[in-house]
Amino acid sequence: MNIFFLSADPEEAAQMSCDRHSIKMILESAQMLSTVLRQHGYDGDTYIYGQTHVKHPSTIWAGKTRANFDWLLSHALALCREYTYRYGKFHKSEEILYRCGELREQYIPAGSLT
C-alpha cells in the first residue's frame, strides 16, 4: 500500500507512473479509499472494498482530510484513464472509485491537503 506522489498534479503524477504502478496503484488506491470510508463510519451495503492496512501511513494520510482523500481519488481516476490509454481496457476498480467519490462528502472530514 503506497502512494507514489510524483507530482502535485494528480493527472501528471498518473502520466508519470511506470507501467507496473499504473496497474497496481489503482487497486491499492481503491482499497485505501474504501478503508478510509469504513473508518469514518460507512457501513452500508453499497459495494466498496473492505478494510485493509488500517494503520498504514498512506491510509492514515488519505483519511485525515477531504482534500487528501480528493487528491488520492483524483490520482486514482487519472490512473484509470492512463490504464485505458495504455492498455485499451477499463480497470475493474474504477467503479469502486466512483462510488467512493459519491460517499466522500458524507463521511470524510473537511480540511486542507496535508
Where are these regions (language model features)?
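Aromatic-residue-lined binding/catalytic grooves and analogous aromatic/hydrophobic interfacial grooves
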Residues: 102-114
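Secondary-structure junction/capping motif
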Residues: 91-95, 112-114
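A glycine-rich phosphate-binding loop feature that marks nucleotide/adenosyl-phosphate handling sites
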Residues: 95-102
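An N-terminal structural lobe/cap that precedes and organizes the functional/catalytic core
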Residues: 1-86, 91
